Regions:
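Metallocofactor- and cofactor-centric catalytic cores in central/energy metabolism, strongly enriched
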Residues: 209
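Active-site-proximal inter-transmembrane loops
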Residues: 139-144, 213-237, 243-244
């Protein structure tokens, strides 16, 4: 792995203060304590918002791998912004740029060139990438509601924090047996959950280009990883994805766990999404042809 310094702009702690505040907020567990209620809400919001990032920001806004209505498109975008990873236009624009230049010097987060730390979180903190690459997402910019959401992306996370505080206060007053409070739900339900969500997502930019095994030749360093697929609801089948980014499913085979795919299939049963794109037959044929041939069994020598 190259250790060559990255030629990007420096960090700006003030402009990224929310990112650091969320991480520091996790220290609040020492003061607010823990309860099964808080842990349950933490994990539930992790899964729900991870789907919003993987199933909406990534598979829909970045790659248009399925279709939906304008209303549900906005709801997906709104849910995605609660993950505190900025708006759908910003997210999709930088991801599309990544696919155009994957693991080259033009890529914004190639771990093999600029290092694992930069690929994981450094680029997110760089002042160079604060604004979206609007020229790459003209299809999204034509929706004024998405532009507004992108501009005011900080509002949904704040509303989520407020809702958690209100819920914690209510449960503390009316269900004391749950042993929770406003502060506890803010710390666990937002700060801890969001921090886990950050680094689960970031692992795809960093570790999914370093660990695992490739099935396809893609011209980059993308890998498939079962562990990363579990913690990101299916994004760990990254080599599959880089071979055919237009596919809604990233686990190409039934044994490749892809929870975001299962959720989208479920939503399609209710008509909320449709035209979910599958990998074509030629992709599966390519995978078969790349399998290492099995050596024929050796016949034992006669005594």
């Amino acid at each position: 792995m190259s250790t060559r310094g990255q030629p990007f702009h420096p960090f700006n702690i003030v402009k990224q203060s929310a990112f650091w505040a969320i991480h520091l907020g996790c220290l609040g567990v020492y003061w607010v304590g823990c309860s099964w209620t808080a842990i349950t809400i933490c994990l539930a919001l992790y899964v729900i918002r991870m789907f919003a990032v993987t199933g909406a920001y990534h598979r829909y806004f970045s790659h248009r791998s399925y279709q939906t209505s304008r209303v549900f498109q906005f709801l997906l975008a709104l849910l995605g912004t609660t993950a505190a990873q900025k708006g759908p236009i910003w997210w999709a624009s930088h991801h599309r740029h990544h696919h155009k230049h994957s693991d080259t010097e033009e890529d914004i987060h190639p771990p093999g060139i600029y290092g694992l730390w930069w690929a994981h979180v450094g680029w997110v903190l760089s002042t160079q990438f604060i604004e979206p690459r609007s020229e790459l997402v003209k299809d999204l910019c034509r929706f004024p509601e998405l532009r507004v959401l992108d501009k005011h992306h900080i509002v949904p996370p704040l509303l989520l924090m407020g809702a958690l505080a209100a819920l914690g206060s209510y449960l503390g007053a009316h269900a004391p047996e749950l042993h929770t409070s406003a502060g506890q739900l803010i710390v666990w339900g937002f700060c801890v959950s969001t921090t886990l969500l950050y680094h689960g997502t970031f692992c795809i930019n960093s570790l999914a280009h370093v660990i695992g095994r490739p099935r396809f030749k893609t011209g980059d360093d993308s890998k498939n990883s079962f562990i990363l697929a579990l913690i990101t609801l299916g994004e760990g089948w990254h080599n599959n994805h880089h071979r055919y980014p237009g596919s809604e499913r990233q686990g190409f085979y039934w044994w490749e766990v892809d929870i975001s795919h299962y959720i989208l299939r479920g939503l399609s049963l209710f008509g909320l999404v449709w035209d979910l794109r599958e990998p074509p037959a030629r992709i599966y044929q390519e995978a078969l042809e790349r399998q290492e041939p099995q050596e024929p069994p050796q016949m034992p020598l006669a005594a």
